[in-house]
Each structure stands twice: as structure tokens, then as C-alpha cells.
């Protein structure tokens, strides 16, 4: 859902998304499947998984699958140290009555975790670190996996979102006139990334 705000797709079959319908845990295994499929078809294309820390925790053991099967995926991990979509639901639809969303000390250092699997990891904590991290990932993404851990604000919301009991046509935050356009400005990055 993070990528849905900015990405522009210009070819068919280049975007996998749960479309806000149960997104947590979808991105990383979907990226592995896309990379395995591309590899089987002889396509040398980069595959990028943009995921939150909560979704990644649901199947982070698949780092082993990625390495064992030589599937060089770029993992862009948005780390807000909580179950972000759950927190956002509780904020928007339940009067900010927060319950069981905070990782506390249970959120690992994902860079160290990636490195334990032999995957390069980079932590991005300031807006000025973004460009070099992306260049690093772009330079290796076809041959080696890499994890980019973006430290973001605890209360960063993700749009669009489907309200409780709703369906795709009821998504909130999809007004084409107000959605940000890529490339993202430095000011927009500074709003998202921690200082």
C-alpha cells in the first residue's frame, strides 16, 4: 500500500497488490513469487517489495527462501515500530482507542536480521540518506538481494485504505487530484522519514 501512493506502471503485469484488502504479510512473498516466475521465464527484471515492519514480521523467515533460491529481491521496509495499518484503523474508525499495536522492544533490527541471512542491509534514518541507499540497491538488484530499512514516523498513515466492511470502490484517499505525484519532493520525504 505504500507504493500505491506514488508508483506509475507503464507495462502490463508489473504490479502485485492486495489493494488494501488484508495487505499485512502479502508483499514479500508476492515479490519472491514474481522473481521466481521472472527467473523461470528468463526475464532479468528487478523486483521490489515495499512492506511495513508488521507485514514483514509475518514471514521474515522467507529471507532464507530468497537466499537459498537465488532470488535477488529489493526489500524496502517501512519501519514505524508498530502495526501501522491496524494503528491507522484504530485512529480513523475507533476513536484512537489503540490496542496491541506497539512492538516495544520486540521489533528487531532488520538490517542485522538480513545480514544474518547473508543479505546486505542499509538503515535509512534521514532524508539525505535516501538517494545513496536507492542507488546502492539499483546497482545490485539484479544480482543480489538487499534490504533497505526506512525509519519512519510512528504515526505515518498509508493511503488508500478500505474502510471496515467496505470494498475496493469505497477506498478512502484515492482522489486523483490530491494524491502526490512522483517524483517525491524533499519536503514530502522529510514529512515521512524520521529526523
How should these model regions be labeled?
Residues 2-195:
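Thiamine diphosphate
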Amino acid at each position: 500500500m505504500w507504493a500505491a501512493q506514488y508508483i506509475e506502471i507503464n507495462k502490463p503485469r508489473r504490479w502485485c497488490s492486495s489493494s488494501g484488502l488484508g495487505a499485512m504479510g502479502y508483499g514479500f512473498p508476492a515479490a519472491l513469487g514474481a522473481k521466481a516466475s521472472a527467473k523461470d521465464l528468463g526475464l532479468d527484471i528487478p523486483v521490489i517489495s515495499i512492506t511495513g515492519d508488521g507485514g514483514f514480521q509475518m514471514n521474515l523467515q522467507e529471507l532464507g527462501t530468497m537466499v537459498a533460491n537465488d532470488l535477488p529481491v529489493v526489500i524496502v521496509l517501512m519501519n514505524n515500530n508498530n502495526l501501522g495499518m491496524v494503528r491507522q484503523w484504530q485512529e480513523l474508525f475507533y476513536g484512537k482507542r489503540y490496542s496491541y499495536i506497539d512492538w516495544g522492544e520486540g521489533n528487531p533490527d532488520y538490517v542485522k536480521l538480513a545480514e544474518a541471512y547473508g543479505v546486505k542491509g542499509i538503515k535509512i534514518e534521514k532524508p539525505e540518506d535516501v538517494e545513496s541507499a536507492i542507488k546502492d540497491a539499483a546497482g545490485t538488484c539484479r544480482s543480489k538481494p538487499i534490504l533497505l530499512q526506512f525509519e519512519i514516523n510512528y504515526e505515518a498513515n498509508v493511503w488508500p485504505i478500505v474502510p471496515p466492511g467496505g470494498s475496493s470502490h469505497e477506498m478512502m484517499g484515492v482522489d486523483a487530484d490530491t494524491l502526490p505525484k512522483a517524483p517525491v519532493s524533499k519536503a514530502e520525504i522529510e514529512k515521512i522519514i524520521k529526523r
